[in-house]
Every structure is written in structure tokens, then in C-alpha cells.
């Protein structure tokens, strides 16, 4: 098996968000390792990816929801032959979502203009790339 490359990791990042926006749920969730942890924009602690995936599916991936994602330049640091960190800025626009705010109010849209995202990817024994950690934070100005 060959070592990871920056372009391979960048392609994986872009693919994750393409699948999310296209609501290709099975393919999108397969990018997350079983052991993955996630810090979302509203997280107070890391959560297992399987829970975050289910929540995102319920909130963002219904038939009526419209999602657009734009990923800026992806900076990749290779930290071993099978592991890399990807850091980037993205924009997310979601309409007709089913989400409850921290204040308990229903939200129907979300717009993240300059969300900061970090992914840690690891190559598995079958050669695929999996996210083992994700952190998304929204810039507050």
C-alpha cells in the first residue's frame, strides 16, 4: 500500500462534502471511522461520530432540505504514512433544515460563512481513508 499524499487527502475532503450536499447518506457516513470523534459547531465536548452522523441526517438530509457547501483551499499535513490532518475554511448554506437551537427554538436554515474545519484522516487496512476526528467551529465576529 502506498503512503498518503496531500492530493489524496484533499480529494477525500471534497468528496465528503459533495456526498453530504448530495444527500448520499451511506457513502457520506462511510467516511467516518467507527472510533471517530467529532466536535461540531455547538459541541461542548467531543461526541462519537455515529451520533453526530445520525443527528446531521435528521437535521440536514431530509428530502426537503437544500444544502450547498463550498470548500476553500485545503492545507494538508502528512503526519505519517497512513495519517494526515486537513485544515480548511468552508461555507455551508442549508435551508429547510429540521433543527432546534441551543435556546430551544426551531431553526429552518443555517449559514456558516467561514467555518474552520479540521479533519484527521487515517488509511485503513482495506486502503480507504476514514475520518478519525473532526472539528468544526464557526467564526464569531
Task: Annotate the PLM regions.
Residues 4-7, 25-82:
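A solvent-exposed, acidic/Ser-Thr-rich amphipathic alpha-helical stretch
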Residues 16, 20-27:
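Short helix-adjacent coil turns
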Residues 57, 71-76, 90-92, 116-122, ...:
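Hydrophobic/aromatic beta-strand elements that line small-molecule binding cavities or substrate pockets
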Residues 95-108:
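Intrinsically disordered, low-complexity Ser/Thr- and acidic-rich flexible linkers and loops
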Residues 105-141:
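Short beta-strand edge/turn micro-motifs at domain boundaries
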Amino acid at each position: 500500500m502506498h503512503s498518503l499524499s496531500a492530493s489524496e487527502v484533499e480529494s477525500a475532503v471534497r468528496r465528503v462534502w459533495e456526498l453530504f450536499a448530495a444527500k448520499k447518506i451511506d457513502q457520506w457516513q462511510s467516511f467516518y471511522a467507527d472510533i471517530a470523534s467529532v466536535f461540531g459547531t455547538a459541541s461542548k465536548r467531543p461526541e462519537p461520530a455515529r451520533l453526530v452522523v445520525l443527528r446531521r441526517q435528521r437535521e440536514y438530509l431530509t428530502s426537503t432540505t437544500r444544502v450547498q457547501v463550498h470548500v476553500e483551499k485545503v492545507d494538508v499535513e502528512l503526519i505519517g504514512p497512513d495519517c494526515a490532518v486537513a485544515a480548511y475554511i468552508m461555507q455551508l448554506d442549508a435551508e429547510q433544515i429540521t433543527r432546534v437551537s441551543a435556546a430551544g427554538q426551531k431553526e429552518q436554515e443555517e449559514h456558516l460563512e467561514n467555518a474552520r474545519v479540521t479533519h484527521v484522516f487515517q488509511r485503513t487496512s482495506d486502503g480507504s481513508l476514514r475520518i478519525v476526528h473532526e472539528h468544526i467551529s464557526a467564526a464569531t465576529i
